[in-house]
Amino acid sequence: MSLVCLTDFQAHAREQLSKSTRDFIEGGADDSITRDDNIAAFKRIRLRPRYLRDVSEVDTRTTIQGEEISAPICIAPTGFHCLVWPDGEMSTARAAQAAGICYITSTFASCSLEDIVIAAPEGLRWFQLYVHPDLQLNKQLIQRVESLGFKALVITLDTPVCGNRRHDIRNQLRRNLTLTDLQSPKKGNAIPYFQMTPISTSLCWNDLSWFQSITRLPIILKGILTKEDAELAVKHNVQGIIVSNHGGRQLDEVLASIDALTEVVAAVKGKIEVYLDGGVRTGNDVLKALALGAKCIFLGRPILWGLACKGEHGVKEVLNILTNEFHTSMALTGCRSVAEINRNLVQFSRL
């Protein structure tokens, strides 16, 4: 079977994975309304192409936090890649490095940070942090990340408690997972996921100044969906926002990411960069997100589908397919560079 689009990879990955792993990757919170709406919301947006423009040369390159990437298509933080491929995040990191894009490594990576860096020493890496109640543990982890050459700290906001993921509860998957980077990097010190001290439930806006005091890295806040929180992010001098609902895995029945993007972009008034994850499956989706103000998009589940199908090569193929589709979408709407993508290219359908 030829795999020519991201949904092909999804179908093929389902055949490769155990039921519990499929459920872990695909599952949403409660009734999965938000998970599904993340995808459906893109289809409620229509394109307004412009013609008679010279598109013989189309350039997909852009920058995030001052670093050039080959296309505005990067890899979102997802945990436990070894569930779907033996060397897990190391394969993901190598694919991202080869593609010339950014990979956000998760706190819940199944490979150590050191091994990921060794696998892809030249790659652009950010680190996603679930804030632990133990501030010293957070500090040690952030300092470790900084010393390893990660270029930004992404703090996840939307997980003060875990969402109600019914499949994971039924499958008791957590008992088979370990957390490598919440202990010493020495081998053998990983702890079971289900024994982990909970993620901090007391994190608040005033705590951001402490993080800013211990690192020189740009701080990106992941999980913002409202203009009120976007305005607070600017007020607290962070460097970026990822508009995200955690792939519909946390609070169900919230806004689709693409539906929340417009108000967040309007609220920050160009003062900080805004990114998006959730629901991107085609090059048109990438174009729509950029037209509505995202600097780039981050892929979650599709990366795991590629990894499950073919490891590093599967992730490369997923990234290549989406980048080629985006290149085509740019050409067919008259955009020769990412800078030419703007709000006039889209309208919200009345259907």
From Swiss-Prot:
Listed under GO biological process in this entry are:
fatty acid oxidation
What Pfam families does UniProt report for this protein, alphabetically? FMN_dh (PF01070)
Co-factor(s):
FMN
Which enzyme type, at the first EC level?
Answer: oxidoreductase
Q: Where is this motif: Microbody targeting signal?
A: 349-351
List the GO terms this entry assigns under cellular component, sorted alphabetically.
cytosol; peroxisomal matrix
Reactions catalysed according to its record: a (2S)-2-hydroxycarboxylate + O2 = a 2-oxocarboxylate + H2O2; 2-hydroxyhexadecanoate + O2 = 2-oxohexadecanoate + H2O2; 2-hydroxyoctanoate + O2 = 2-oxooctanoate + H2O2
In which broad location class does this protein mainly occur, judging by the first location in its UniProt entry? other
Q: Where is the FMN hydroxy acid dehydrogenase domain?
A: 2-351
Keywords, in A-Z order = Fatty acid metabolism, Flavoprotein, FMN, Lipid metabolism, Oxidoreductase, Peroxisome, Phosphoprotein
| Nucleotide-binding recorded as keyword | no
Query: Which tissues express it?
Result: Expressed in the liver and kidney.
Q: Phosphothreonine modification sites?
A: 178
Please give the positions of the paired cysteines in each disulfide bond: none
What does the record give as EC number? 1.1.3.15
Q: Where is the active site?
A: 246
A single Gene Ontology molecular function, please? Answer: (S)-2-hydroxy-acid oxidase activity
* List of residues binding a 2-oxocarboxylate: 130, 165, 249
Where does the record say this protein resides? Peroxisome
Residues involved in FMN binding: 77-79, 106, 128, 156, 222, 277-281, 300-301
Pathway where this protein functions: Lipid metabolism; fatty acid metabolism
Which protein family is it in? Belongs to the FMN-dependent alpha-hydroxy acid dehydrogenase family.
Tell me how this protein assembles. Answer: Homotetramer.
Protein known as? 2-Hydroxyacid oxidase 2
In its UniProt entry, the species of origin is given as Homo sapiens
